[in-house]
Amino acid sequence: METSPISPMNEKNTAQPQQREENAQQILNTAIPFRQRSPGLLPEALKVGVRPDPANQIVETQEIEHPVAGFEGDSDQFQVSTNEMAEHLQASDLWYCPDGSFVKKIIVPGHGLDKPKLGSKCQVLALGFPFGSGMPEGWTELTIGIGQWREKMWGELMEKCLESMRQGEEAKIHLPGSSAPLAKLRLDSFTNGRDSWEMEAMEKEALAKEEHRRGTELFRAGNPQGAARCYGRALRLLLTLPPPGPPERTTLYANLAACQLLLGHPQLAAQSCDRVLEREPGHLKALYRRGVARAALGDLEKATADFKKVLAVDPKNRAAKEELGKVVIQGRKQDAGLARGLRKMFS
């Protein structure tokens, strides 16, 4: 994995203050675009039941001996000089969120192996979120996967950051393209939470409905990445229920397919549509979205079949008509190109 140059703790930095500041700026400016070059969620992250392991995303260096001055303790003392920040930027660990939405700079490493998960109650010190964002300031208790705080502007980002942290960890959140931190977090403690297999069926269904609702809100707000994350969480909960499972699974797979198409992953979208059509062969949205996915993959014959199935039930479906027309034109171009190639071969 590509990493940015990070100086060891035991190497004395003799650079002038201005040079150290420039070095620190360069570290974040070069590190952040590393993840930003891959827009959208990683394909693996969009598969149901597969989540990127945050432990694999961290660039490990030697353990930090001293936290950034002012973060530990009274929030009124939260003042760090530019030179101090520059030195710590060079020595800190950087963790890249798998979907490219932020970079976490670890100031004080946590301890233990456990991290918060669904249902974990986290004691958090949050500082620096923009005024009016609705995010908590100071000490607060947040529950992973539950609560209106997740619906705020920075709620999803904060939740993803907490899910990557260990007990006692202090970190700063940086947005792509910015060396100035958005906010600072300290995860003081958290309860264990529970894995899905430990929950009752009714509890799983209730949590899945909450994730479904949140995903739909994010999708309508133009955030297919966040929506896909919520739909995936809901499906992982429902997939642990005895078959055939609740009918909501069908809608979740169809919605997930829409997100995957917008994020440029037609293969995954086609697979999600297959799951829908296994349960409801006449599901028009799944047929249409699978047709779009197959067309993007170059499987024009199967794409045509899907669009024709939609039009057989709904002859006035304008979107299906338009996509079918595009597929027909694309097929004619392919046939013409093949004919030209054959003529050259036998001329």
Curated annotation (Swiss-Prot):
Chain segments annotated as coiled-coil in the UniProt record: none
Keyword Aminoacyl-tRNA synthetase in record: no
Pfam families the record matches: TPR_1, TPR_16
Any one GO biological process: regulation of angiogenesis
Name recorded for this polypeptide: FK506-binding protein-like
Region (Disordered): 1-24
Xref: PROSITE patterns: TPR (PS50005), TPR_REGION (PS50293)
Database matches in InterPro entries: FKBP4/5/8-like (IPR050754), TPR-like_helical_dom_sf (IPR011990), TPR_rpt (IPR019734)
Residue(s) carrying Phosphothreonine: T3
Superkingdom to which the source organism belongs: Eukaryota
The keyword Nucleotide-binding is assigned to this record: no
TPR repeats: 208-241, 250-283, 284-317
Keywords attached to this entry: Phosphoprotein, Repeat, TPR repeat
Source species: Mus musculus
SUPFAM superfamilies: FKBP-like, TPR-like
GO cellular component: extracellular region
Function, as annotated: May be involved in response to X-ray. Regulates p21 protein stability by binding to Hsp90 and p21.
Record-linked Gene3D superfamilies: Tetratricopeptide repeat domain
